[in-house]
Design a protein with these regions (language model features):
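Short conserved segment of the HATPase_c
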Residues: 142-155
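Short helix-loop "hinge" at the ATP-lid/N-box region of the Bergerat-fold HATPase_c
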Residues: 110-111
Length: 210
């Protein structure tokens, strides 16, 4: 059986020529918002489950990111985001669905707290012990005294209009998923200038082991 969201998607796609471009854009935007809410609920349940179905394998990071950006395209286009993707052909060893969920929540966070000329920069550096993925935006950022609490459940920080509407679940779920996948997270921010989140993928197999 098809879910209501997939039926909505099919209806929008099939009736594309009957809907004005502006209405189509608005409906795509609403669909993306609904999809994100459903995704959060599903992963919240998954993270609390005693049986996990993670599949660890080498993942092409660019492919993974591309799918996430495609999912969020209506929201990114609505805000007129500029995406700067500096990734090459890197692979990381992790669970694909889990990583895509993390990246999706990080992108969603950047959209919610974006500036007037929003930009998202994705890059990677390599150290001896880890591959380090950085996702940086130029949005409103987080105040210094709030930064230690951003991964706490329900945290929304300063009471700006956009934060008043937030649930405070996105980055909490990112941290929970990172813990499950044995990934380390770090976040830095300058209030009014942007927010950066860094994911460390440990080089676990450098000596032939996993």
């Amino acid at each position: 059986a098809k879910s209501p969201l997939s039926l909505l998607a099919m209806l929008l796609d099939n009736r594309n020529d009957e809907i004005s471009p502006s209405l189509q854009a608005k409906l795509d935007y609403v669909r993306s918002q609904l999809q994100e809410d459903v995704t959060q609920m599903l992963y919240y349940a998954r993270l609390k489950s005693s049986t996990k179905d993670y599949q660890f394998k080498d993942i092409n990071l660019n492919d993974c990111l591309g799918e996430v950006l495609e999912d969020y395209a209506p929201l990114l286009e609505e805000k007129q985001f500029v995406i700067i993707n500096k990734l090459q052909s890197e692979t990381v060893y992790t669970d694909r669905r889990g990583l895509q969920f993390m990246l999706g929540q990080i992108v969603s966070n950047a959209i919610k707290y974006s500036s007037d000329s929003p930009m998202l920069t994705i890059s990677m550096i390599h150290s001896e012990t880890a591959d380090i993925l950085s996702v940086e935006d130029n949005g409103i950022g987080v105040k210094k005294y709030d930064l230690p609490y951003i991964f706490q459940k329900g945290f929304t920080g300063d009471s700006t209009d956009s934060r008043k509407k937030a649930t405070g679940m996105g980055l909490y779920l990112v941290k929970k998923m990172a813990d499950d996948l044995n990934l380390h997270l770090e976040a830095t921010s300058q209030w009014g200038k942007g927010f950066k989140i860094v994911i460390f993928f440990p080089k676990l197999r450098s000596n032939g082991g996993k």
